[in-house]
Amino acid sequence: MTDYKATLNLPDTAFPMKAGLPQREPQILQRWDSIGLYGKLREIGKDRPKFVLHDGPPYANGTIHIGHALNKILKDMIIRSKTLSGFDAPYVPGWDCHGLPIEHKVEVTHGKNLGADKTRELCRAYATEQIEGQKTEFIRLGVLGDFANPYKTMNFKNEAGEIRALAEIVKGGFVFKGLKPVNWCFDCGSALAEAEVEYENKKSSTIDVAFPIADEAKLAAAFGLPSLAKPAAIVIWTTTPWTIPANQALNVHPEFTYALVDIGDKLLVLAEELVESCLTRYGVEGTVLATAPGSALELINFRHPFYDRLSPVYLADYVELGAGTGVVHSAPAYGVDDFVTCKKYGMVNDDILNPVQSNGVYVPSLEFFGGQFIWKANPAIVDKLTEVGALLHTTVIEHSYMHCWRHKTPLIYRATAQWFIGMDKEPVSGDTLRVRSLKAIEDTKFVPAWGQARLHSMIANRPDWCISRQRNWGVPIPFFLNKESGELHPRTVELMEEVAKRVEVEGIEAWFKLDAAELLGDEAPQYDKISDTLDVWFDSGTTHWHVLRGSHPMGHETGPRADLYLEGSDQHRGWFHSSLLTGCAIDNHAPYRELLTHGFTVDESGRKMSKSLGNVIAPQKVNDTLGADIMRLWVASTDYSGEMAVSEQILQRSADAYRRIRNTARFLLSNLTGFNPATDLLPAEDMLALDRWAVDRTLLLQRELQEHYGEYRFWNVYSKIHNFCVQELGGFYLDIIKDRQYTTGADSKARRSCQTALFHISEALVRWIAPILAFTADELWQYLPGERNESVMLNTWYEGLTELPEGFELGREYWDRIMEVKVAVNKEMEIQRAAKAVGGNLQAEVTLFAEDALTADLAKLSNELRFVLITSTATVAPFVQAPADAVATEVSGLKLKIVKSAFPKCARCWHCREDVGVNPEHPEICGRCVDNIDGAGEVRHYA
């Protein structure tokens, strides 16, 4: 028996079947570093249009988690796809470095008794160390960026830039000092930004408290009565007993109806709608004597239950009837609505009672409760109310309450003198900041679109922005205040520039060690140098000013603007929000043209990641077990507009999909052995019809993928690439060409046509997967035939694909119909194989009984139809001749009959043919194979 294996063009490639990503990816990273890939991209991008994705800086604290990985991978996929689309797309990673979490870490490690200077020194060192760790982890994900020169908010230049940004906002007239209730954390000893507030369930004591009437005649008149026959009181309901000592007013809704209720020993004022529920709660019965609108109660005085002072009734639209009594007790120091209402009625700052100190302890001078921590004072306050006969009811409820994101402890609103950026303050010129910001939102594209309404609602309803903090590790607010008037120095903007120059050289320490006389001269004794620092959201929120202008100036006529900001959905109240406000205050537009929001990671059951649940997926572990490309493929395959489920099982499914794509790439490479595109590439017009279709199909898909990449629809990109590999290539084209590829002459037109198509497909595919499978694409790039540069990323989308000419006989619709026929044949073949009627496709003879139109289509392939169907024989007969045992198919006008071939099997091509053994020199092979070995070789026209 002759061994004909040597006469076949068997596939061969060094591209490994087993990816070994955990070992191979670090080697690829080293190669990128050694060739200076990022620098090369900047060099070739000099004359390209620029695309700027501005990095929202992660906090320089701790190792990265799966959310960080998701965020950075999404950004990297965009940067890579934009680069392949012909843009210069730099990526400058950033880090947020100041703020309480780092200061807290330093205090835990080194103690709280450090001096301010030492604290700042240790914070800077800690942040530097954390950045290095995170940087290594981000690079390991395959993120391509300028990691050698990242931006850090603690860089001296950026600290100075932040001061200059603040100076611009001061110059615009947006900054003011005011007493306002702000989110306050006792553990932080500082105000908190809205984005630093989390809501958790908390148990609180609720109390119904009676405030006795002081103006009896006015109350009687309000209810249309000549006098009050009994003692009367108005009843409030609150979940914060600790605020009762600071009560200064009582709020009713002007349009609600209030009732005067006789309960036997006294009269109570309650919202009419809530009378029944209140009396039930108090365990009493009563009769409504009269009703009056809330507006009739305005300015009637009641008495504080245990202090000798009055509490007037003020009208307020925020009073609700959902719970309580319809009357709100007002402590203006501890509630924003209370504060606003009391100010509206003329209360001045000096009259606002604020007995709670920054640590949560009442001032020592507070009668009854001085020196007590507010949460612990609640029972004492309840006891006092009981003692004076003012407590009508108390119970404990569990409700959602604001907590510090860092300490997980309850917060309060607390009125403090702080610096604010005013939302509705009239600026030096132009619209207010709220108006500017709302307009800017309308001019911004949102992905997904619902983000626009969300951010709009937040801006429309937000209070003034408290930008001052009482901490050490932060960029200073370099203001000098006149000791007598409390006003800013008239040369504040000029002085801020002088401070910025010093900070640029020495860092924020320059301000804290500055002697005021150095800048103010003889004026120094008249001014206080303040010690407040800026909210960290101002740090990151001004990076468009002090980073974009430096790293990649856009040349925008009114200031820098990035093409894209991309972060998690929590950043609508965080970085997107603060950046919008500062951008509109300085440049009167958003610092971004487009906002992309991704959801949070959850497990397969939709639960949040939690160590206690054991469902945490650590990116470091994924890198070490599956490889970063598997994680990248998971990111690409998931619709990021909602929650993104991830688990070991989900990642394993991504690994399975990866293997299918890799195996397709390996098949392409292995069949390009011996192919030199410089000499063997055929022009489109010389290629076989099926090969031309394959290249045309690749071109059409590339256009779709470019559109999906441009719209950041990575899950569509993944789905289409995966389906192309598995169905159109693996299930159709690659299956068909094996016979031609292996059995025809090595340099025959039939084989070179096929290899030309495979080469074009490979050149396109390697680019398509490059934004997602960053490592695998670059590995694949090294194995493709022909001269090429060092990395797939140094190229653009493949331009060698050709479209089928219009009117081409075997065009797109034709091959779609043939594909349907092939699917029908395969389906019936599986049934016959399962029944053991045939062993394999090449043992089968198929007869296709087709109606006229389909018969004409099938006839166009002539005797090459069998190669398309991968059967030894394929015969077409009229539909009406179909015997009773012919099988109907899902293809209209087609029935099939499959039988086992009676002819011998060719030892070379494995087809069962009647001419096997006809040539005495080759008794084991068919005539076609003899011709391919010893003759001129078979000629193919179609497939």
Swiss-Prot record:
Pfam families reported in the protein's UniProt record: Anticodon_1, tRNA-synt_1, zf-FPG_IleRS
Cofactor note: Binds 1 zinc ion per subunit.
Short motif ('KMSKS' region): ranges: 608-612
GO biological process: isoleucyl-tRNA aminoacylation
Keyword RNA-binding: no
UniProt comment concerning the protein's domains: IleRS has two distinct active sites: one for aminoacylation and one for editing. The misactivated valine is translocated from the active site to the editing site, which sterically excludes the correctly activated isoleucine. The single editing site contains two valyl binding pockets, one specific for each substrate (Val-AMP or Val-tRNA(Ile)).
Subunit structure: Monomer.
Protein name: Isoleucine--tRNA ligase
Lineage of origin: Bacteria, Pseudomonadati, Pseudomonadota, Gammaproteobacteria, Pseudomonadales
